[in-house]
Amino acid sequence: MQYMTIVAFLAATVAAGPQIRAYPSIDQITVAQANNACGNNMQVTCCNKVTNTPAGNAVGNGAGILNNLSLFDQCSKLDVNVLAIANGLLNKECQANAACCQNSGGSATGGLVNVALPCIALSSLI
């Protein structure tokens, strides 16, 4: 009886463990793999400008909350529908900074807290 309890416990532990994505490094990933890493509602983009400064708030200069956040600008969408690009390496198609951006615009105005963070660095998702 104890054997079955141990086997059931180990099976439950393995099933509840985090899912590990088997993506290669950012230098070896294809555009299709990058598109899969971005998921549904996001698209692979190539951004020319990245700002790595923390955003300020009422508690000091960011208080360490957003220190690892990068803001992307001057981004252009990579077309994944073209077969030649989908099979090519991402670093050949995007010489700048690859990011996953939301399909909606990154505009946030007129609210109490105006935050528009539509892009996430691809390297943080793989």
Curated annotation (Swiss-Prot):
Signal peptide region: 1-16
Summary of the knockout phenotype: Does not affect pathogenicity in a corn seedling infection assay nor the production of microconidia, but affects microconidial chain formation.
Subcellular localization: Secreted; Secreted, Cell wall
Name of the molecule in the record: Class I hydrophobin 1
Induction and repression of expression: Expression is positively regulated by the cAMP-protein kinase A (PKA) pathway and more specifically by the adenylate cyclase FAC1. In contrast, deletion of PKA catalytitic subunit CPK1 has no obvious effect on the expression of HYD1.
InterPro entries: Hydrophobin
Assigned keywords, A-Z: Cell wall, Disulfide bond, Secreted, Signal, Sporulation
Family to which this protein belongs: Belongs to the fungal hydrophobin family.
SMART domains tied to this protein: HYDRO
The keyword Disulfide bond is annotated on this UniProt entry: yes
Function: Aerial growth, conidiation, and dispersal of filamentous fungi in the environment rely upon a capability of their secreting small amphipathic proteins called hydrophobins (HPBs) with low sequence identity. Class I can self-assemble into an outermost layer of rodlet bundles on aerial cell surfaces, conferring cellular hydrophobicity that supports fungal growth, development and dispersal; whereas Class II form highly ordered films at water-air interfaces through intermolecular interactions but contribute nothing to the rodlet structure.
Organism, scientific name: Gibberella moniliformis
Lineage: Eukaryota, Fungi, Dikarya, Ascomycota, Pezizomycotina
Alphabetized GO MF terms: structural constituent of cell wall
Top-level lineage group: Eukaryota
Main location as per UniProt: secreted
Pfam families xrefs: Hydrophobin
The keyword S-adenosyl-L-methionine belongs to this UniProt entry's keyword annotation: no
Cysteines joined through disulfide linkages: C38-C100, C46-C94, C47-C75, C101-C119
A single Gene Ontology CC term: extracellular region
